[in-house]
Amino acid sequence: MDMSGMDGMDHMSSTSSNMSMSMKMYFHGTIGGDLLWFASWMPSSAGATVGVCIGLFILAIFERYLVAFRRACDAAWRRGQVGYVRPCSNGPLVFSSGKSTSLPPPVLFNRRSSTKKEKDVYNPLTPSDYALESNQDGSVEPVTPYTPSIHALRESQEGSSAPSYAHSQQGQAQAQGSGVGCDPCAEGRVAEIERCKEKAVERGLVHSHLPKAVRRSLDPGREGRWSRPFRLAVDVPRGLLQALQTLIHYLLMLVVMTFNIWWMISVVIGCGVGEMLFGRFGSSHVGH
């Protein structure tokens, strides 16, 4: 009977039992005895534990930076651009349609200011604010902006395969070419049509076969499609960035599974500091 095999099995069982006994499955603050990802990474002194805590703190901050960087990349990828959108606190705002609008300087109000002054500062557009046209007899009547009805939207969707967005864009381009593009009445009509289309999409009158969350995220220039075409310069970096985020998430999860209080505190504080530093960048585009 071979006794060497029995001895080897006994040695393996004793090693596994010692390892299971050394792993504490409860919150503890003892120094030494906890493995960090690899068998050789076992801090056994106070200085080594402090170094590990600093490294985990920096890794947690980097994880929140990656989340903010992903939001900046998504903001550019939704516009069909390669790269990422740099954060800025002033200057023109660039929308998905390619237009840019400059922000007015902030207005400071006095606490004792009257309601009349506040109304003068913020005055929303109403149909009476549009341009006025004079009749032959000299009388003046306001021009009511054109808003397409729901039946017109349904007929345009069922009768024609081309999206109504293209027609509105062509009409706007023709108006600009003929010198009418600067007319505030024409701009108001285009804005009113876009708002009516957005409400119809949200109510499910257009693309009713898609979920509500998907209808809200549709690209107005590609209403007939749910997804954008595959691009190597956009989708390959997206996959690599997601893989890096997943790797860091699992590394931090393994750190938390050691139940070491000092390591967990380092990760939690690092995530909080990282969110404080980078959470405001691109937070309006994509959350986490």
UniProtKB/Swiss-Prot annotation:
Membrane topology value: Multi-pass membrane protein
Localisation per UniProt entry:
Cell membrane
Q: What are the Low complexity biased-composition ranges?
A: 168-177
Give the InterPro entries listed for this entry.
Answer: Cop_transporter
Membrane spanning stretches: 42-62, 251-271
Induction conditions: Expression is induced by copper deficiency and regulated by the CUF1 copper-dependent transcription factor. The CTR1 promoter harbors the Cu-responsive element (CuRE), which is critical for CUF1 binding and activation under copper-limiting conditions.
Q: What happens when the gene is disrupted?
A: Leads to a severe growth defect in copper deficiency conditions, but does not significantly affect melanin production, nor fungal virulence. However, when both CTR1 and CTR4 are disrupted, the colonization in the brain and subsequent virulence are significantly reduced.
Provide this UniProt record's keywords sorted from A to Z: Cell membrane, Glycoprotein, Membrane, Transmembrane, Transmembrane helix
Coiled-coil positions: none
Q: What is its main location?
A: membrane
Q: What are the start and end residues of every segment in region (Disordered)?
A: 106-125, 154-180
Family assignment?
A: Belongs to the copper transporter (Ctr) (TC 1.A.56) family. SLC31A subfamily.
Described function: High affinity copper transporter involved in Cu(+) import into the cell upon copper-limitating conditions. Functions with BIM1 and probably also FRE4 and FRE7, where FRE4 and FRE7 metalloreductases liberate the Cu(2+) bound to the BIM1 copper-binding site for subsequent import of Cu(+) into the cell by CTR1, via the reduction of BIM1-bound Cu(2+) to Cu(+) to reduce binding affinity for BIM1 but increase affinity for CTR1. The BIM1-CTR1 pathway for copper uptake plays a key role in colonization in the brain where copper amounts are low and thus in cryptococcal meningitis.
Q: How does it assemble?
A: Interacts with the copper acquisition factor BIM1.
Cross-referenced PANTHER family? COPPER TRANSPORT PROTEIN CTR1, SOLUTE CARRIER FAMILY 31 COPPER TRANSPORTERS
Put simply, this protein is called: CUF1-dependent copper transporter 1
